[in-house]
C-alpha cells in the first residue's frame, strides 16, 4: 500500500482530516492533520459554539496509531512528526475553499498571467494575496487592493483617491499552491459578524 493511502486511511479512521504529507531529508516524515469540517447549517449556526482546534492529545493519538500502521506496512522513516496545520494552512480541495471563504489567502499559479493580465498586473506575476470569494462563474476569485498599508499615526489626505479593488478568477487546476495568509493581529481578536459581542 502507498504511503499516502496508509496515512489517509489511518487519519480518517481516527476522525481527522489529512492536510499534508511531507518527507524531508534525514528521514523526517511530517504529517499535518485538522479536524473534519462540517459545513454550517441553520441548526449549527444557531447554536453558540466555540471554534475547535487540533490539540496535542489529538497529535499524540494519531502519532501512536501511525507508528503501528507504518511499521506493519514497512514504511522507512527515521522520525515521525504529527502537527496541526498552523496559521498558513494549505488549501487543497473544494471543501477547504468553501471552509475558508472570506479569509485572506496566498495563491501561486502554475503559469504566469501573461496576456490575460491586461496591463493591470505584471504579466509574469504568479503570486497573489487577497480575500477568497466565490466568483459569479461558479469558480473562485481573490480580491485585493494595491493600496499601501497605513502606518500608525500617519495622516491620510482626504483628496487621495483610494486604489481600486482588483479581482483574479481561477480554478483549482490553475493553482500550484494556496494557503491561508499568515496574518497575526497582536491587538486582540475581533468578533466576526454574527458572533456574540
UniProtKB/Swiss-Prot annotation:
GO terms for cellular component: cytosol. CDD domains: YlxS_C (cd01734). The keyword Cytoplasm applies. InterPro entries: Ribosome_maturation_RimP, RimP_C, RimP_C_sf, RimP_N, RimP_N_sf. Pfam families: RimP_N. Gene3D superfamilies: RimP-like superfamily, N-terminal. It is found in: Cytoplasm. The keyword Cytoplasm applies. Its main location: cytoplasm. GO terms for biological process: ribosomal small subunit assembly; translation. Keywords: Cytoplasm, Ribosome biogenesis. It comes from the Bacteria. SUPFAM superfamilies: YhbC-like, C-terminal domain (SSF74942), YhbC-like, N-terminal domain (SSF75420). Belongs to the RimP family. Required for maturation of 30S ribosomal subunits. This is Ribosome maturation factor RimP.
